[in-house]
Amino acid sequence: MTSNEELLQNYCSILFTYKTIGISNLHLYYFRETEIKSLRQLINAEFAILQTCNRVEIYLYSNTNTISEINKMIQYLNNVHNEPIGNQARVICGKDSIKHLFLVASGADSLSIGEYEILSQIRSTIDMFKKLGFSGKYLQILFERAIKVGRKVREETSISKGKVGIYSLAIDEAKRQFNNFYDRKIVIVGAGEMGQKIANMLYNEGVKNVTIMNRTVEKAKQLALKFGYNYEKLDLDKLGSFDIAFISISHENLRLENKWNTLIVDITVPPLFTGNNVITLEELEKISKLNFKAREEELVKINKLVEDGIDELIYDYKKEIYSEFMSKIMKRVETIRENEIVRAYKELEKLGINNQQVKEILDLMTRSIIKKSFQPLFDNVRSLVFDGENSINYINFLIDIFKDGNIPIFETKKIKKKQISKRSSS
C-alpha cells in the first residue's frame, strides 16, 4: 500500500448487493427512515446509505476509528433484524471501498449494465444525508468525485450506448414477444416512481392503449391524464383482460401465480408473480449481462478511468486537509492579532494618541506582517501535503500546536522518535 493510499483508509463501506445476497432478498435489508435517524445517536462518523433496487450500501468516514464505527453499525443491524445479518455483509475499506463506489457510479456494477439512473441516486443520497447532518465534507468529496467518474466513463466509453436501463430492457423484452406490440392492450400496476418511468417510456414509444392501476385511484388518474392514458383502481383479478402487465407495486411478501395468458413483466423486489409468462428483474439482469458481453473490452477503459478518479480523489482529499489546516491556523492567528491591536491601541491612548488613522495603520501593518511571516510556512506545508511521504503526521502535529499554543507531550515524544528513526535509517 502506498502512502497516498494510506490516506484513504478512513473510508469504509458495508455492502449488501444483488450479487451477494440476491435481488429477491435485498428488500429485507432496506433501512426505514426511523432507523436511519436513530443511527445519529449511535455512529460517531460521517455516513451515507445508498439504497436502490440493486443494493444497500453504507459508506462511512471517520478520522478516529472507522472500524469501530463499522462494528457498531453491524451490531445495530443485527439488533434491528433480530438475526446476525451483518455476517452477510461485505466490508471493505480504503482504496477498495472507493473503487467500488466509482464502479457503481460508472454503471459497471449495476444489474442493468451502464444504466444512468445510479448517478441521480448517488446525488440524491449524499444530498439527503448532508441535509440530515449525517455526512460531512469528506463523504461529500468522495460522492462528488464518484459522480464525476460516472459521467466521464459514459462520455469516454460505450458502456451506456443503446438501451441499457432496466425499464428499457423490460419494454424491449415485451416487444420481443409480440410482433404487433403497439396494438396490444397494456396495464401498468403502480403509479409510483417505477410506474411513472414505464408510462413515460411507453408514451415515447408511441403506445396508446395503456391503463394505469393504483391503490389510490387519484394518483393513477394524475399519471394517466399526463399521457392521455386510462386509469382504474387496483384490481389484480383484471390482469387477464390485458396482453401485457408491468408490475411495480410494493407488497408484503405476497406470491401470486400468473393464471392468465397475460405477459407479466414484474420489476418489484421481491417479485409479486411467479409461473409461466413472467419476466422478473433477475431475468432482466441476465439479459443485461448478455448485452454487455459484446462490450467487455470497455472494462479495461473503465478500470483506467476509475484509477484516475482515485488519484483525483487523493488530490481532493489532500486539498481539503490543507484548507482545514489553513483555516485553523489563520483563525488562531487572527484572534491573537485582533487582541494585540486592541491592547496596543489602549497603550497609545494612555500616551494621548487617539486617532482612527493610527488604528487603521496598525490593522494594515499587522496583516502585512502575518502574510509575510506565514507565507513561507504555508508554502512548505503545501509541499508536505501534496508531495511529502508523511504529510498527515506533520499536519496533525501542526494543528495540535495551534490548538492551544503548546506542543502536547505525547506528540513531542512521537516526533522525536520519528526524527531519531529517520536519522538512523539515513
From Swiss-Prot:
Pfam families: GlutR_dimer, GlutR_N, Shikimate_DH. The record marks 100 as: Important for activity. InterPro entries: 4pyrrol_synth_GluRdtase, 4pyrrol_synth_GluRdtase_dimer, 4pyrrol_synth_GluRdtase_N, GluRdtase_CS, GluRdtase_dimer_dom_sf, GluRdtase_N_sf, NAD(P)-bd_dom_sf, Shikm_DH/Glu-tRNA_Rdtase. The active site is at residue 53. CDD domains: NAD_bind_Glutamyl_tRNA_reduct (cd05213). Pathway: Porphyrin-containing compound metabolism; protoporphyrin-IX biosynthesis; 5-aminolevulinate from L-glutamyl-tRNA(Glu): step 1/2. GO terms for molecular function: glutamyl-tRNA reductase activity; NADP binding. Substrate binds at residues 52-55, 110, 115-117, 121. It comes from the Archaea. GO terms for biological process: protoporphyrinogen IX biosynthetic process from glutamate. It catalyses: (S)-4-amino-5-oxopentanoate + tRNA(Glu) + NADP(+) = L-glutamyl-tRNA(Glu) + NADPH + H(+). Its EC number is 1.2.1.70. Keywords: NADP, Oxidoreductase, Porphyrin biosynthesis. NADP(+) binds at residues 190-195. PANTHER family: GLUTAMYL-TRNA REDUCTASE. Belongs to the glutamyl-tRNA reductase family. Possesses an unusual extended V-shaped dimeric structure with each monomer consisting of three distinct domains arranged along a curved 'spinal' alpha-helix. The N-terminal catalytic domain specifically recognizes the glutamate moiety of the substrate. The second domain is the NADPH-binding domain, and the third C-terminal domain is responsible for dimerization. NCBIfam families: hemA, PRK00045.4-1, PRK00045.4-2. During catalysis, the active site Cys acts as a nucleophile attacking the alpha-carbonyl group of tRNA-bound glutamate with the formation of a thioester intermediate between enzyme and glutamate, and the concomitant release of tRNA(Glu). The thioester intermediate is finally reduced by direct hydride transfer from NADPH, to form the product GSA. Homodimer. Catalyzes the NADPH-dependent reduction of glutamyl-tRNA(Glu) to glutamate 1-semialdehyde (GSA). This is Glutamyl-tRNA reductase.
